[in-house]
Structure formats: C-alpha cells, structure tokens
C-alpha cells in the first residue's frame, strides 16, 4: 500500500520524494499505535476539562489558560489525528474537497491555538512573577478570557488563506483531486513567513520570558533566605513581653522585632499620672480586632488598659480616662501565636482579596500637647499610638507574607510552565527544522522522517495533560478523585 503524505501545520504534501510502499501487515501496528495515542489524547484532555469544571479549587485565572490549551489539544486529538490516520490508510484522498478543507482548517487553527495558548500562559506567569501584587489587581477572569479569545481569533485567521487563497491572490494552482492540500502548498515565501510568526518568534519570546521568570524567582528565593537568616518568618512571629532586665541597646541597633515590641515611652511628651486618692481599676481590654475568617491572622488581642478616674485642674471635674498601665504594657497574643494554618491552600481569588486588604499604611501619627492637658493627652495618645504602631507593623509584615505566599505559588507555576515549554519545544522543533529544510530543498525529503515529525508535534497534545497533575497538587488530587484512585 502506498504511504501518502500527511497534512501538517504549515506544510501540505511538500515532501515530494519517491513513494514508498508498505504492506498492510506492516501498516496495521502503526495504525494501532497512532489510534491509541489519539484515544489517550482525547481522554486526558476531557479529564482536564472535567476536573476544572468540577473542582472549585481549580477555578482560578491561571487555569483559564490551561483550559484554552486543553481545548486546542482536544481538537487535535478528536479531529486532526483521526483524519490523519484515515488518510494514512487510504491510498488517496477520496472524502471530497469540503471535508478536506475542514480537516486542514482544524489542523491549522488547533495547532496554532495550542502554540498561542502556551505563549499567553508564559506571559501571564511572567507578569505574575515580575509584579505579583500589582498584577493581581489586573489579573481578572474577564481580562484573561479576552486574551484567550484574542489568541483564538488570530488562530482562526488561517481559515482565510485556506478557503480563499486563489481568490485573494488571483492565481490558479494545479490541484490534485486525490490529495488533500492547501492552495498555497508550493508558495515558499508564505509558508516561511507563517512559520516564523507561528513558531519561531513565539518560541524565542517564550524563552526570553522564561529566563526572566527564572531569574526573578531565583532572586526572590535568595532574598527570602537572606531575610530568614536574620528575621523569623511570619508564621513564627509571636510577640513577647518586654525583657524584665531591660537590656540596653544602642540607638539604631534594634532589630525590627524589637522595634515592634518596644513600648513607645514618652511618645506624647509625658507620662500618665494617677490620682493618689483613687485606686486604679484594672480590667482586661476587649479584643481590638478579630478576623475569624482570615487564614493568615487568626486573632489578636490588645494589651490590658487601666480605667483611671482622673481630675484635671483645667476642667475641675472628674471623668474616666483610659491610660496605659506601664506594668502591663506588653502586647498579648493567643498562646498559639499567629495562626497560619491552611495559608498554603489559599486559592488565587482569595489571595487577590487578601492582598488588596493589605493597603499601604499611613505614616505614624504624632501627638501634640496642649497647655494644661499635656499629661492627660499624653497618656491617651500613648495607648492609641501603641495600638496603631503595632497594627501597622502587623499589616506591613502580613503584606510581605502574602507576597511571599504568592511568590511560592508562582515558583510552582513557573515549574509547570517550564515542563510545558520543554514538551512544546521538543515536540515541535524537529518538524519546523525539517520544514525549513524542505521549504528550500523539495528533493531533500525523507517521507518516513517527515511523518514522524508531524506526529511528534501531535503528541505534544498528549503530553500536556500529563504535565498538569505532575506540577499541580490540586490537579493531582482531582484526577485521583475522578478516577477513584486511592493514595
């Protein structure tokens, strides 16, 4: 049986070398292998789409690009591969010109959409790593969907030359009815130009983006290691009372945590004077703030305040006044410290909400002393300033912690992108190198090698859904749940 030439992304039957024959017993094992690859491709990509649809943890902006890539791969496995196998079994194309144009259109569109989906996924990862918190505000499902639609729109532009090349170029090419090929199959300049736009240029840009991603993640890891070498991590923060021995520190030599727990003495220019004729009534202060639903900060308590009845000379009347008891002026926390349990499982949408809550803090508030009321305002502002001071510090470190969590997630996402790009380049580069050779040397064609490079590009659609669970724990758990696989 004659082995026909196969359709491909940017070339249709350009390989015009000597025909080789293959007996049916020799051809059937190849057909079985290719059919198995086709079925596996369809099954795995359907599994990815069902997993994203059924698991809420996978409803993230980043996975929209994965869905786009999976849809393109599904078209390759469900339409392009089977018709290529059918064409392989036939000695000539006998299914008619309309079905041929449909197959060619799906081949070009799906393969290009797969390439562009990897490209926009790479851009998304690049921006997430370079500007994590700023890009999170921009990174919405609406914008991601618009980007994906743009990529598919560009891919569908292939339909124009496939269906109307002779009409627009006003040239008539010799068309063989027993072959399924485009009207521009012998136009070298057009095929080289589209190869550069469809593959070489996106690939070079992706390599540049990924180099930047790798550099940014590496620098971030080195920066965090440097910080962790001198400061405790956010999950280890536990505010402790003042050192009873009162070890003296030189100005400017205090660590940030010592500044955080330091009492702002004399912040208002004086200390609180209690009335000698009255006894201070101590009571435990209520909770300053409680974030029961927050996954990073569980519950923080303020220090105890004293309700001190005071009488001032200026007013001549007594009233209750909130003052700081210096003997209880430390910040108390829960025995478990700051609860960070479950922070690693925060979804991207939750991370977006949390990161937006950590807004830029205002500058520290200074106090002014009025004549006759200086000591009274001093005590009040000391307590309030200490609360504000501590809260601003906690929000500042919480912001850094959220940024750190985001970078850890992006490091894993960058790893996933690295595997996807490696599979993409390894699968497609042999075909495009071979294509550039035969584009200028039509006699330099080995028919079996040509077919091998075509199917190697198709196999990229089979490998992509295998990469997701290897690099994403949520995909892995969802796949096991759907397939009823017990760990």
Swiss-Prot record:
Chain positions found as Phosphoserine = 230, 344, 347, 380, 396, 398
- Region annotation Important for agonist binding: residue ranges? 107-112, 424-428
Query: Cytoplasmic side of the membrane: what ranges?
Result: 51-64, 124-144, 212-416, 470-487
Question: Residue spans with biased composition (Polar residues)?
Answer: 353-369
Disulfide cysteine pairs (residue numbers): 100-180, 441-444
| Record keywords | Cell membrane, Disulfide bond, G-protein coupled receptor, Glycoprotein, Membrane, Phosphoprotein, Receptor, Transducer, Transmembrane, Transmembrane helix
Q: Which GO terms describe its cellular component?
A: dendrite; plasma membrane; synapse
Superkingdom of this entry's organism?
Eukaryota
Which residues are exposed on the Extracellular face of the membrane?
1-29, 90-97, 165-188, 441-446
Glyco sites are at: 5, 18
Q: Which SUPFAM superfamilies match?
A: Family A G protein-coupled receptor-like
UniProt lists compositionally biased (Basic and acidic residues) regions at 238-261
Which residues hold histamine? 107, 112, 198, 431
> Which Pfam families does the record associate with it?
7tm_1 (PF00001)
> What modifications follow translation?
Phosphorylation at sites in the second and third cytoplasmic loops independently contribute to agonist-induced receptor down-regulation.
Membrane topology per record? Multi-pass membrane protein
**Sites of the modification Phosphothreonine?**
140, 142, 279
Domain notes for this protein: Histamine activates the receptor by forming hydrogen bonds with transmembrane domains 3 and 6, squashing the ligand-binding pocket on the extracellular side and opening the cavity for G-protein engagement on the intracellular side.
Its annotated function is as follows: G-protein-coupled receptor for histamine, a biogenic amine that functions as an immune modulator and a neurotransmitter. Through the H1 receptor, histamine mediates the contraction of smooth muscles and increases capillary permeability due to contraction of terminal venules. Also mediates neurotransmission in the central nervous system and thereby regulates circadian rhythms, emotional and locomotor activities as well as cognitive functions.
The family classification in the record reads: Belongs to the G-protein coupled receptor 1 family.
Record-given protein name: Histamine H1 receptor
Q: Which organism is it from?
A: Pan troglodytes
The lineage, from the top, is: Eukaryota, Metazoa, Chordata, Craniata, Vertebrata
Gene for this protein?
HRH1
């Amino acid at each position: 049986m004659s082995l026909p030439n196969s359709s491909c992304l940017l070339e249709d039957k350009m390989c015009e070398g000597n025909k080789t024959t293959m007996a049916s017993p020799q051809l059937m094992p190849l057909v079985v292998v290719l059919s198995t690859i086709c079925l596996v491709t369809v099954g795995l990509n359907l599994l990815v789409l069902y997993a994203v649809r059924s698991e809420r943890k996978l409803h993230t902006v980043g996975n929209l690009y994965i869905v786009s890539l999976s849809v393109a791969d599904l078209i390759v496995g469900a339409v392009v591969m089977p018709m290529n196998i059918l064409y392989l079994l036939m000695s000539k194309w006998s299914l008619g010109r309309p079905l041929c144009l449909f197959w060619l259109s799906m081949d070009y569109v799906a393969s290009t959409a797969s390439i562009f989906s990897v490209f926009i996924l790479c851009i998304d990862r690049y921006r997430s790593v370079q500007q994590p918190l700023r890009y999170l505000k921009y990174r919405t499902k609406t914008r991601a969907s618009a980007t994906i639609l743009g990529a598919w729109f560009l891919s569908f532009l292939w339909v124009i030359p496939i269906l109307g090349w002779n009409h627009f170029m006003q040239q008539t090419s010799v068309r063989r009815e027993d072959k399924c090929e485009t009207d521009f199959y012998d136009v070298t300049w057009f095929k080289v130009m589209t190869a550069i736009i469809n593959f070489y240029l996106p690939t070079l840009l992706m390599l540049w983006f990924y180099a930047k991603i790798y550099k940014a993640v590496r620098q971030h890891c080195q920066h965090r290691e440097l910080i962790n070498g001198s400061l405790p991590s956010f999950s280890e923060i536990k505010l402790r009372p003042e050192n009873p021995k009162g070890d003296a520190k030189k100005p400017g030599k205090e660590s940030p945590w010592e500044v955080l727990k330091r009492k702002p003495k004399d912040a208002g220019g004086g200390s609180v004077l209690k009335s000698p004729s009255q006894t201070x009534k101590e009571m435990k202060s209520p909770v300053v703030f409680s974030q029961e639903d927050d996954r990073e900060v569980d519950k923080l308590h303020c220090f105890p305040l004293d309700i001190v009845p005071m009488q001032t000379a200026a007013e001549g009347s007594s009233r209750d006044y909130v003052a700081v008891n210096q003997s209880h002026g430390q910040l108390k926390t829960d025995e478990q410290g700051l609860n960070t349990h479950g922070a690693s499982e925060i979804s991207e949408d939750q991370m977006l909400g949390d990161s937006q809550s950590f807004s830029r803090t205002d500058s520290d508030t200074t106090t002014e002393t009025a004549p006759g009321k200086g000591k009274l305002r001093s005590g009040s502002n000391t307590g309030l300033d200490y609360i504000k001071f501590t809260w601003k510090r906690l929000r500042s470190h919480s912001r850094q912690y959220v940024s750190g969590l985001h970078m850890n997630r992006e490091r894993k996402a960058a790893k996933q992108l690295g595997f996807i790009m490696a599979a993409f380049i390894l699968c497609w580069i042999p075909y495009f190198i071979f294509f550039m050779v035969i584009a200028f040397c039509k006699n330099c064609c080995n028919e079996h090698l040509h077919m091998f490079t075509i199917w190697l590009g198709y196999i990229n659609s089979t490998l992509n859904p295998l990469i997701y669970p290897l690099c994403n724990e949520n995909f892995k758990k969802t796949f096991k749940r759907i397939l009823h696989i017990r760990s």
